[in-house]
Amino acid sequence: MADMIKVKLVRSFVGRPDKQRRICASLGLHKMNRVKELPDNAAIRGQINKVCHLVSVVD
């Protein structure tokens, strides 16, 4: 399971730019406090980095 990463939406994207909303949607995060398990690759890491103020990585 080392090549999977769990991401949780901890802040709302209401009032955020449309690009950040689309990034959250592409990560599968549509509601607050939901956790998604995603593959750990460079593309996903880059998306998480763009919205790092809205999400957290859960261990």
From Swiss-Prot:
Keywords: Ribonucleoprotein, Ribosomal protein
Source organism superkingdom: Bacteria
GO cellular component, as recorded: cytosolic large ribosomal subunit
InterPro entries in the cross-refs: Ribo_uL30_ferredoxin-like_sf, Ribosomal_uL30_bac-type, Ribosomal_uL30_ferredoxin-like
Record field: transmembrane: none
Entry's Gene Ontology BP terms: translation
GO terms for MF: structural constituent of ribosome
Alphabetical list of SUPFAM superfamilies matching this protein: Ribosomal protein L30p/L7e
NCBIfam families assigned: rpmD_bact
Subunit structure: Part of the 50S ribosomal subunit.
Family: Belongs to the universal ribosomal protein uL30 family.
Annotated protein name in UniProt: Large ribosomal subunit protein uL30
Organism (species): Magnetococcus marinus (strain ATCC BAA-1437 / JCM 17883 / MC-1)
